[in-house]
UniProtKB/Swiss-Prot annotation:
Keywords: Cytoplasm, Hydrolase, Protease, Serine protease. GO terms for molecular function: ATP-dependent peptidase activity; ATPase binding; serine-type endopeptidase activity. This is ATP-dependent Clp protease proteolytic subunit. PANTHER family: ATP-DEPENDENT CLP PROTEASE PROTEOLYTIC SUBUNIT. It is found in: Cytoplasm. The active site is at 109 (nucleophile), 134. It comes from Rhodospirillum rubrum (strain ATCC 11170 / ATH 1.1.1 / DSM 467 / LMG 4362 / NCIMB 8255 / S1).
Length: 216
């Protein structure tokens, strides 16, 4: 018997379908596709190339639909592959649409970098969310020359990630380097004080026209 990816099992069997009434009758969507119509994107679980490709495609699609309207990006992730996360990060910076980020559950490692990379003033965490930052890690094997090459690469990645955190948090480089030396867990309030987020949100308020919007 072939073991199935638990994420595939989840997506294929546990994601609910919603039915929408249209002029042409009923139309069914999986819940994430329906939320995409409302410009809502989710990152759940590990960050890898497959997930990154889907999220980048959704960001580009929503920009093509309306480049001036906000995109809401909900994050509940332990992190994952650095280069995959950087693909999402670069796409967030590339598109014209403002990206509002919200941490629900956890945003660790690359998840925290994507959280802080949202539009300034529109980066949120829910009260019980946990945020964790740390330096990149990896295991290498092979000839000494190969290990040396990989070590230089991971040090370069660390420097690049540090400078991205500096850009989005406003913290000096020395503070970021110290904070990321080991696993550094933060509460929602601590992440706000550090500059990873802008507000802690408990519930959404109703705007004057009846639409919901985030409140801090």
């Amino acid at each position: 018997m072939i073991d199935r990816d638990p994420i595939d099992v989840f997506n294929n069997t546990l994601v609910p379908m919603v039915v929408e009434q249209t002029n042409r009758g009923e139309r069914s969507y999986d819940i994430y596709s329906r939320l995409l119509k409302e410009r809502i994107i989710f990152l759940t679980g590990q960050v890898h190339d497959g997930v990154a490709s889907l999220i980048c495609a959704q960001l580009l699609f929503l920009e093509s639909e309306n480049p001036s309207k906000d995109i809401s990006f909900y994050i509940n992730s332990p992190g994952g592959v650095v280069t995959s996360g950087m693909a999402i990060y670069d796409t967030m910076q590339y598109i014209r649409s403002p990206v509002s980020t919200v941490c629900i559950g956890q945003a660790a490692s690359m998840g925290s970098l994507l959280l802080c990379a949202g539009e300034a003033g529109k980066r949120y965490a829910t009260p019980n969310a946990r945020i964790m930052i740390h330096q990149p890690s990896g295991g290498f094997q092979g000839q000494a020359a190969d290990i040396e090459i990989q070590a230089r690469e991971i040090l370069a990645l660390r420097e690049r990630l540090n400078r991205i955190y500096v850009k989005h948090t406003g913290q000096p480089l020395e503070t970021i380097e110290r904070a990321m030396d080991r696993d550094n867990y933060m509460t929602a309030e601590e992440s706000r004080a550090f500059g990873l987020t802008d507000s802690v949100i408990e519930r959404r308020a109703l705007s004057d026209d009846g639409d919901t919007k985030s409140s801090s």
